[in-house]
């Protein structure tokens, strides 16, 4: 998947018809997980080069959709996706973005702890994201199954970026809660449709994902669970991603922060990137990028569970 190119005009037309003036419930009308987004029923998601996108870069945004975190998906639909795509085109930190949206929940309690769109390069990513179910539950158990996103990316994504060009994609999880320490065998089977010989820890899953993906997590420091308890959230994330756990103070700057961390990871100076944004966004991005080093990597191939 991933033909076509993002167009601000296409976005404006789509947004006017399907997003503007609508409530969250009116935007996201699904009341159950649709089969086409059920990871257990998906054999493989593909990001392929094409005439439109000859050097495709897969980018996954995996958003917590439990509790109040439906606000992330809503903000992406209202303007974030357009900002993300147009700024990547304009700034060119990576080539030819192919965007996938994931909805993340709790594999211990939720009916739909992971939902997965296709990789798309045009307005189809917005059309699919709008069909995700904002289940809104979460287990109330002090964590979410963000690692389901990493395990899917490691085992069920095939991309020309690493298979042909030796380049990694970008996987950014976003939320307000601590991360559960991996997934049990039963959870892996139920959520992903994969048979595993044993439970997998968060470190084991991350090691699999990091072979092909530049992995980051954005903590929404002033939202939901993290508000007043951000240290509890960081205590679970920082040991896993010490330099790639990003604290975001203002969710309105989410898309700009994602673009910025890609720029820095591709070699730009954090101070220069932050200064390139206007007004308060520059300050929010500068704070989010604190301590993040520039680094690059090469891809290595699809992962299999034994």
Residue spans for each PLM region:
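Acidic, low-complexity intrinsically disordered regions
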Residues: 1-306
């Amino acid at each position: 998947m991933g033909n076509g190119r993002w167009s601000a005009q296409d976005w404006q037309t789509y947004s006017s018809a399907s997003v503007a003036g609508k409530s969250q419930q009116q935007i996201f009308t699904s009341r159950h997980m649709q089969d086409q987004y059920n990871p257990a029923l998906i054999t493989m998601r593909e990001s392929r080069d094409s005439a439109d996108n000859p050097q495709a870069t897969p980018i996954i945004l995996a958003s917590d959709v439990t509790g109040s975190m439906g606000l992330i998906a809503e903000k992406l639909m209202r303007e974030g996706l357009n900002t993300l795509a147009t700024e990547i085109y304009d700034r060119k930190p990576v080539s030819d973005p192919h965007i996938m949206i994931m909805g993340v929940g709790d594999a211990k309690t939720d009916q739909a702890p992971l939902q997965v769109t296709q990789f798309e390069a045009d307005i189809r990513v917005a059309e699919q994201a709008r069909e995700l179910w904002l289940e809104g539950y979460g287990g109330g158990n002090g964590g979410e199954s963000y690692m389901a996103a990493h395990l899917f990316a490691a085992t069920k994504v095939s991309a020309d970026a690493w298979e042909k060009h030796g380049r990694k994609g970008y996987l950014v999880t976003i939320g307000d809660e601590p991360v559960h320490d991996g997934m049990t065998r039963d959870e892996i089977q139920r959520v992903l449709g994969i048979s595993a010989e044993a439970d997998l820890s968060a470190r084991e899953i991350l090691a699999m994902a990091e072979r092909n993906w530049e992995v980051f997590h954005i903590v929404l420091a002033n939202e939901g669970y993290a508000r007043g308890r951000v240290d509890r959230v960081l205590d679970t994330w920082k040991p896993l991603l010490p330099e790639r756990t990003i604290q975001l103070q203002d969710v309105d700057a989410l898309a700009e922060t994602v673009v910025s961390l890609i720029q820095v990871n591709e070699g730009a100076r954090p101070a220069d990137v932050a200064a390139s944004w206007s007004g308060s966004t520059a300050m929010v991005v500068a704070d989010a990028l604190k301590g993040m080093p520039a680094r690059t990597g090469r891809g290595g191939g699809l992962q299999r569970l034994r």
